[in-house]
């Protein structure tokens, strides 16, 4: 379980993370949020963080979150945006256990941040490059409260906290 958040992009229809087994295997898309989500990104530009608490299940093993996919309908037509280069946030899945991985916030910094991008850049419209930085935060105080209403079958006192690194 984790919160997937984004800040600094507008006109998004959906945002997902991509994970894969460290020792090879098929990638898995972790749907962060879409147009029907409570965290749907509005068509108005603001710097407010938007996101969604998500629960997902994977077989036991070592994984990494390595990329993201954003879809939008306002960058001159339907577009899909992904980073130019992958990043890596490893995590472990243990059989029979529910783990909280934290809040992965992908912060976009616009054209002006490209030269100083600490992690990566994406192309918008095939012409304009903007910077992003993924940041892991521990927001369990907020997330565990939300978990009780969104995922009542999960009990906070039984969830192992294993933040992404």
Predicted segments with their positions:
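A short tyrosine-centered beta-strand micro-motif
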Residues: 58-66
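Tryptophan-paired
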Residues: 26-57
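Primarily secretory-pathway and cell-envelope proteins
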Residues: 1-36, 69-165
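Extracellular structured ligand-interaction cores
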Residues: 53, 60, 86-88
